[in-house]
């Protein structure tokens, strides 16, 4: 029955599909918000009213894209679908908890939308810093609703993380060790550990903010012996691991795609890749204050956070060069998925280089809160995470649906998206270097040219999003079924047919090592 299957589901494939659909829908909302931002900034002068409504849109854009698009698709969608298939498990360890993880997200999303509908909205930025987020600057329920929304999304992610850790450690076939699991499984494991360790700190921080706003506590109010900088430390102790949570599953997917379309049986430097991911996960927890170089920390503290941040470039470099080595000498098949992977490797590296620039505390004091930072993190997210999602989608779409996408449309789609995002975000480096600050709805005329170019790019990206919807419709309408899949010996997820049956591995898998 429909309700039993989709509302009360305990099947990892169905829940994965729900996550993918929810993430795609939220992605449309987030894209719409970003188009509003770029429309406002397309020329000097006001389009939408005041800065409050602008900042509400910016805040909602960030939350929607992070918590309701990237995380549900990468961890919930691809994670749920692929992890059990890749390790030969019949399902996730806690199938009902898996369902709850998903169904906490729509209410969370509704709370976030409600926060923008009542009062003046939460125009705090996604960081929700007090005193701007306090009850003086933001009276009314908007920020409280945003906090509750984050609580629900956080609980959802923590439950999901527990589920993935248990599944990956306990549900492998007896003969399979952790070092024989595919890299995507490793990436989800590291991501889950990061979620489990970082989200409780965010929960603590926003709960304190909630009591500051409603119960007269003074955790972040100097008048009562509190300190708003404490909130920043708590938030960024979560916030920095969070950005690695957003990109690590992408690393795993890119490893699979690069290997598959190079005609290789395994990625180059498997153990190096695993240790690089674990190193990135560990280092991600000890660099948080690089987001706070301008709050007046000691020079020795700044020196430490500068060097620690730069160290992350080493394992990241290991991954980039291992991907290139995987491609090297392979029998390259120029599929759309490989194009996304190549685009990812190039653009993620560019974003990483601007990250190295920002790691220097002396330079960051000048560049902090300018469009240089916006350009940096959109290169690693809008062209890192999103390119990985798109690559994973066009690669595994035949597995999920049983149908194939039109390869020509898929390549055209990649091209449009590639041009669009680069045209949107590359000029923002110039704006940042010439001092244009973030989070303002208007700007001096001197910045007009690059803002106009950037806004044009965003509309090209919008075209790509619409084309993707068409591509998916076309695939389901044409019903080109999958005939054969290559390289199944080292890609277990394809072994059960396309799409796999409702229950796979009903008896324990026999794995010969």
Swiss-Prot record:
Residues that coordinate or bind O2: 244
Principal localisation: mitochondrion
Cofactor: heme; Cu cation
Membrane topology value: Multi-pass membrane protein
Chain segments annotated as transmembrane: 12-40, 51-86, 95-117, 141-170, 183-212, 228-261, 270-286, 299-327, 336-357, 371-400, 407-433, 447-478
Sites of the 1'-histidyl-3'-tyrosine (His-Tyr) crosslink: 240-244
Sequence ranges on the Mitochondrial intermembrane membrane side: 41-50, 118-140, 213-227, 287-298, 358-370, 434-446
Cofactor note: Binds 2 heme A groups non-covalently per subunit. Binds a copper B center.
Sites where the protein binds heme a3: 376
Binding site for Na(+): 40, 45, 441
Cellular component terms per the entry's GO annotation: mitochondrial inner membrane; respiratory chain complex IV
Binding site for Cu cation: 240, 290-291
Pathway membership: Energy metabolism; oxidative phosphorylation
Oligomeric form and interacting partners: Component of the cytochrome c oxidase (complex IV, CIV), a multisubunit enzyme composed of 14 subunits. The complex is composed of a catalytic core of 3 subunits MT-CO1, MT-CO2 and MT-CO3, encoded in the mitochondrial DNA, and 11 supernumerary subunits COX4I, COX5A, COX5B, COX6A, COX6B, COX6C, COX7A, COX7B, COX7C, COX8 and NDUFA4, which are encoded in the nuclear genome.
Family of this protein: Belongs to the heme-copper respiratory oxidase family.
Cited function: Component of the cytochrome c oxidase, the last enzyme in the mitochondrial electron transport chain which drives oxidative phosphorylation. The respiratory chain contains 3 multisubunit complexes succinate dehydrogenase (complex II, CII), ubiquinol-cytochrome c oxidoreductase (cytochrome b-c1 complex, complex III, CIII) and cytochrome c oxidase (complex IV, CIV), that cooperate to transfer electrons derived from NADH and succinate to molecular oxygen, creating an electrochemical gradient over the inner membrane that drives transmembrane transport and the ATP synthase.
PANTHER family: CYTOCHROME C OXIDASE SUBUNIT 1 (PTHR10422:SF18)
Protein's name according to its UniProt entry: Cytochrome c oxidase subunit 1
Protein species of origin: Dugong dugon
Name of the encoding gene: MT-CO1
């Amino acid at each position: 029955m429909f309700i039993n299957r989709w509302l009360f589901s305990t099947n990892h494939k169905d829940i994965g599909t729900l996550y993918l659909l929810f993430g795609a829908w939220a992605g449309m909302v987030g894209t719409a918000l970003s188009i509003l931002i770029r429309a406002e900034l397309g020329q000097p002068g006001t389009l939408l009213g005041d800065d409050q409504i602008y900042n509400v849109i910016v805040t909602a854009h960030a939350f929607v894209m992070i918590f309701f698009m990237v995380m549900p698709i990468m961890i919930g969608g691809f994670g749920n679908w692929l992890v059990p298939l890749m390790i030969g498990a019949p399902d996730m360890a806690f199938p009902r908890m898996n369902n709850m993880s998903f169904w906490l997200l729509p209410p969370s999303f509704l709370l976030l939308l409600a926060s923008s509908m009542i009062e003046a909205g939460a125009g705090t930025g996604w960081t929700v810093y007090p005193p701007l987020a306090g009850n003086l600057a933001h009276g009314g329920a908007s920020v409280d609703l945003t906090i509750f929304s984050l609580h629900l999304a956080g609980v959802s992610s923590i439950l999901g993380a527990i589920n993935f850790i248990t599944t990956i450690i306990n549900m492998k076939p007896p003969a399979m060790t952790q070092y024989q699991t595919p890299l995507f499984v490793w990436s989800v494991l590291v991501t889950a550990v990061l979620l489990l360790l970082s989200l409780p700190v965010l929960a603590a921080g926003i709960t304190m903010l909630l009591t500051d706003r409603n119960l007269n506590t003074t955790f972040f109010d100097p008048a009562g012996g509190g300190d708003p900088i404490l909130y920043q430390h708590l938030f960024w102790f979560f916030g920095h691991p969070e950005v690695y949570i957003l990109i690590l599953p992408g690393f795993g997917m890119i490893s699979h795609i690069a290997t598959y379309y190079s005609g290789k049986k395994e990625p180059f430097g498997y153990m190096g890749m695993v240790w690089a991911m674990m190193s990135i996960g560990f280092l991600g927890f000890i660099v948080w204050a690089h987001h706070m170089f301008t709050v007046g920390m000691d020079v020795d503290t700044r020196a430490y956070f500068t060097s620690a941040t730069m160290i992350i470039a080493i394992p990241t470099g290991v991954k980039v060069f291992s991907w290139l080595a995987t491609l090297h000498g392979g029998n390259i098949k120029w599929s759309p998925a490989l194009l996304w992977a190549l685009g990812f490797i190039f653009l993620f590296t560019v974003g990483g280089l601007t990250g190295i620039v920002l790691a220097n505390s002396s330079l960051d004091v000048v560049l902090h809160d300018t469009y240089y930072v916006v350009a940096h993190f959109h290169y690693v997210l809008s062209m890192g995470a999103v390119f990985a999602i798109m690559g994973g989608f066009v690669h595994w779409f035949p597995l999920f649906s049983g149908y194939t996408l039109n390869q020509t449309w898929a390549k055209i789609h990649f091209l449009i998206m590639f041009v669009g995002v680069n045209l949107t975000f590359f000029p923002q480096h110039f704006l940042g270097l010439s001092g244009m600050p973030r989070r303002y709805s208007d700007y001096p005329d001197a910045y007009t040219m690059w803002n106009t170019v950037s806004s044009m790019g965003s509309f090209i990206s919008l075209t790509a999003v619409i084309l993707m919807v068409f591509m998916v419709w076309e695939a389901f309408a044409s019903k080109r079924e999958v005939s054969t899949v290559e390289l199944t010996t080292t890609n277990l997820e394809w072994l059960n047919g396309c799409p796999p049956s409702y229950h796979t591995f009903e008896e324990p898998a026999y794995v010969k090592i």
